[in-house]
């Protein structure tokens, strides 16, 4: 990856529009997980975090990398309980690499407006402590 390649164009990911379309197809029980990278991590290093989230996601869990390097992951069923389980799986892998204190996870139920759900999950992640999972209320 060159320095000029935007974070939002990593391979093996879905675009924001594809993510939102897929989320809109979930009729009930879905969740959105957002992983926010600490501001202390240089922008150039954030693609590595995004690639790890993609690597730890399952085939049926689309991942969208946002412009600032945050990663949104779609959980199709099981609601916030499944969302927490997915976020925990990713954070456990990050912990093995000693990266868990530089990333935060937020989970929100998938409602009728997937974009709002993504924002709620991101807000929960931003407000939560490093290495932890926060659930939007």
Predicted regions and their residues:
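Regulatory sensory/coupling modules that transmit signals to nucleotide-handling catalytic cores
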Residues: 1, 88-98, 102, 136-137
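Amphipathic HAMP/coiled-coil signal-transducing linker helices
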Residues: 1-16
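CheY-like receiver
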Residues: 17, 21, 25, 85-92, ...
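Active-site-proximal structural segments of metal-dependent nucleotidyl cyclase/transferase enzymes
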Residues: 15-39
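Short, conserved charged micro-motifs
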Residues: 41-48, 80-85, 116
């Amino acid at each position: 990856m060159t320095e000029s390649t935007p974070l939002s164009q990593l391979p093996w990911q879905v675009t924001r529009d594809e993510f939102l379309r897929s989320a809109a197809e979930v009729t009930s029980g879905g969740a959105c997980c957002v992983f926010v990278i600490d501001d202390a991590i240089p922008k150039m290093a954030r693609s590595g975090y995004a690639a790890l989230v993609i690597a730890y996601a399952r085939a049926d869990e689309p991942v969208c990398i946002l412009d600032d390097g945050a990663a949104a992951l779609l959980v199709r069923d099981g609601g916030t309980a499944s969302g927490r389980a997915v976020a925990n799986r990713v954070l456990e892998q990050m912990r093995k690499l000693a990266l868990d204190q530089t990333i935060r996870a937020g989970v929100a139920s998938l409602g009728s407006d997937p974009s709002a759900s993504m924002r709620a999950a991101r807000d929960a992640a931003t407000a939560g402590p490093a290495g932890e999972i926060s659930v939007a209320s």
